[in-house]
């Protein structure tokens, strides 16, 4: 009771404004049936990684639904379940493409990855971090001006791009194929409900976030990222893949497939250091698609697009320039000296509205499924008032057809599971049926030990549903997130005190990412001292498989130290190899 009072007081220090920043993070409506029966249900959030398929058939089915949803919407042949976030998913594509270079490319050390300057800024920064230790050079620029050469092995582009623009990349992917280069597309999954999927115009890999499928922003996470590709890449794809098999009685059954790619088996030869990644959030996203079905998703996407079109038309009539030509939910606006960014921002903050302010003086905004007609009127009043004009009244607006030359013609979500459970009762029963096929800590102890074996108390998880924690965008001004910052400061102080270290990073999104961040810090330290040659990592043979996989990603050479049958380090072997 005292704790809940305390945490609510902290939550109250966060300010929940109407936020239109976008950049891969969106306000969502989480269906109550999913929030109550999955997100807040220990039958789902305390289950262990499904290494033992016999006690995980429910979650495996939900994750298979996730893969099917991603494959359908992207137009690809294969998807995993799942990854940590969109930026690291793009980095995983970079690693995969680099490993898949042909013999001639390896021989001439083709090591250049082109990255569109219209990708999200966090994706570009992450690619810069991940590329350096493994010898990949980034070429960042305008995709329409790229001159292909034999040093470029791959490319990363955004669809729709950071300004909301929908580009026709058919010529781009054709040129890439002629150059024997791979193309990764970072795509907004909701836009693909209406938009021609990348799989139909030549993409080799499609990545992105499933956050806007019913998972709150949470000041930046956690959310499940998706990764979709073609069959030819199946032995190089990162992360878990759920496959359909047959049990000992000859009945259909689900299991994790192609595990020989993964760190717990391949270790330093693994395709990635990723283990199970945000499976609970992937399950929530899959259930969002199951609950709404293809027609429901089309209504949601259509509403988002129509509201954006209507807003753009009205802003143009006020004298602003909408610079984005074809768009789904995001527009970039030229102010045309009608007002300054400073004035607009001042008036927006007074009205508790967050927009995205560009370095050249433009303003961008992104519409989402929570945006109502009242919200559109508030935005129009904001822009009109800043220009000294009257926005006038706003009439009900009908659905506006999507751009014909970019419209999707292929069907989505045809499978029975996406066309059966559209009432709360039906959905609740389906979720419960799957839950009953699983073993979680609300049933019994699970006799498997690993980094994920912990029980989050109900009182710890309840605050996650509070709007003051759930509905904050990661790029809002810091004075709107004082509650979060207080928690960060207190947690950082406690961790420093308990570990004896001087500082701590809360950024890593998983244990595997934490060890990678640590190894990258060690690497940076040696480089700062001119000791870049110190690149050997001694790792016990009994260490978790992510350890050697992360060391390789950090550009290190792995030397394995022997262990006894109980996993204890052989000290004599350690001394010999450390000498």
What are these regions (language model features)?
Residues 18, 51-55, 72-91, 495-518:
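Short loop-beta-helix segment that forms the pyridoxal 5′-phosphate
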Residues 215-228, 232-233, 277-281, 371, ...:
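Conserved phosphate/anionic-ligand binding catalytic regions in large, soluble enzymes, centered on
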Residues 41-53, 71-76, 107-110, 138, ...:
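Gly-rich Lys/Arg/Thr-decorated short loops/hinges at beta-loop-alpha junctions or inter-strand turns
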Residues 305, 318-348, 367-370:
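Conserved PLP-binding catalytic core of the aspartate aminotransferase-like
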Residues 252-254, 258-264, 268-289, 296, ...:
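Conserved catalytic alpha/beta cores of large enzymes that bind or transform nucleotide phosphates
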Residues 88-253, 315, 332-333, 346, ...:
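Conserved PLP-enzyme active-site core in the AAT-like
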Residues 1-65, 71, 265-266, 404-490:
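N-terminal entrance/gating region of PLP-dependent enzymes' catalytic architecture
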Residues 213-314, 318, 323-325:
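Active-site C-terminal subdomain of aminotransferase-like
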């Amino acid at each position: 009771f005292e704790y809940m009072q305390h945490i609510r007081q902290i939550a109250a220090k966060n300010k929940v404004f109407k936020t239109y920043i976008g950049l891969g993070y969106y306000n969502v409506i989480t269906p109550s049936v999913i929030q109550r029966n999955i997100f807040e249900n220990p039958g789902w959030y305390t289950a262990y990684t499904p290494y033992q398929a016999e006690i995980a058939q429910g979650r495996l089915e939900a994750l298979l639904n996730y893969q099917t949803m991603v494959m359908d919407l992207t137009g690809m042949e294969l998807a995993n379940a799942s990854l940590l976030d969109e930026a690291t998913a793009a980095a995983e594509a970079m690693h995969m493409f680099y490993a898949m270079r042909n013999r001639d490319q390896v021989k001439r050390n083709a090591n250049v990855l082109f990255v569109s300057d219209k990708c999200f800024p966090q994706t570009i920064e992450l690619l810069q971090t991940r590329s350096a230790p493994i010898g990949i050079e980034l070429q960042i620029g305008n995709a329409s001006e790229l001159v292909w050469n034999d040093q470029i092995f791959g490319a990363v582009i955004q669809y729709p791009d950071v300004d909301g623009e929908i580009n026709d990349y058919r010529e781009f992917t054709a040129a890439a194929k002629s150059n024997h280069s791979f193309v990764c597309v970072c795509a907004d999954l909701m836009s693909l409900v209406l938009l021609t999927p990348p799989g139909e115009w030549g993409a080799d890999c499609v990545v992105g976030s499933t956050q806007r499928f019913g998972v709150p922003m949470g000041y930046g996470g956690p959310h499940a990222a998706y990764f979709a590709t073609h069959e030819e890449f199946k032995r190089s794809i990162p992360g878990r893949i759920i496959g359909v098999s047959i049990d000992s009685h000859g009945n259909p059954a689900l299991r994790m497939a192609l595990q020989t790619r993964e760190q717990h088996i391949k270790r330093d030869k693994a395709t990635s250091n990723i283990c199970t990644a945000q499976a609970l959030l992937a399950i929530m996203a899959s259930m969002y698609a199951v609950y709404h079905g293809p027609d429901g998703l089309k209504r949601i996407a259509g509403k988002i697009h129509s509201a954006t079109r209507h807003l753009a038309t009205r802003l143009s009539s006020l004298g602003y320039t909408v610079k984005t030509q074809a768009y789904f939910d995001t527009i970039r606006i030229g102010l045309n000296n009608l007002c300054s960014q400073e004035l607009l921002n001042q008036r927006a903050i007074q009205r508790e509205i967050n927009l995205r302010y560009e370095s050249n003086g433009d303003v961008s905004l992104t519409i989402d499924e929570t945006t109502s007609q009242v919200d559109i009127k508030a935005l129009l009043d904001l822009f009109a008032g800043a220009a000294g004009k009257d926005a006038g009244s706003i009439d009900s607006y009908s659905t506006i057809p999507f751009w014909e030359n970019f419209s999707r013609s292929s069907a989505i979500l045809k499978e029975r599971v996406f066309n059966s459970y559209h009432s709360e009762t039906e959905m609740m029963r389906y979720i419960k049926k799957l839950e009953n096929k699983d073993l979680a800590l609300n049933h019994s102890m699970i006799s498997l030990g690993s980094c994920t074996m912990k029980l989050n108390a109900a009182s710890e998880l309840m605050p996650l549903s509070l709007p003051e924690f759930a509905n904050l965008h990661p790029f809002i001004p810091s004075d709107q997130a004082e509650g979060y910052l207080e928690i960060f400061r207190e947690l950082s102080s406690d961790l420093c005190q308990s570990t004896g270290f001087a500082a701590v990073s809360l950024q890593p999104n998983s244990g595997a990412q934490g060890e990678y961040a640590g190894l990258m810090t060690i690497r940076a330290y040696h480089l700062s001292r001119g000791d870049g040659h110190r690149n050997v990592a001694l790792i016990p043979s009994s260490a978790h498989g992510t350890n050697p996989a992360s060391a390789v990603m950090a550009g290190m050479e792995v030397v394995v130290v022997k262990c006894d049958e109980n996993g204890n380090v052989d000290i004599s072997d350690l001394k010999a190899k450390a000498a």
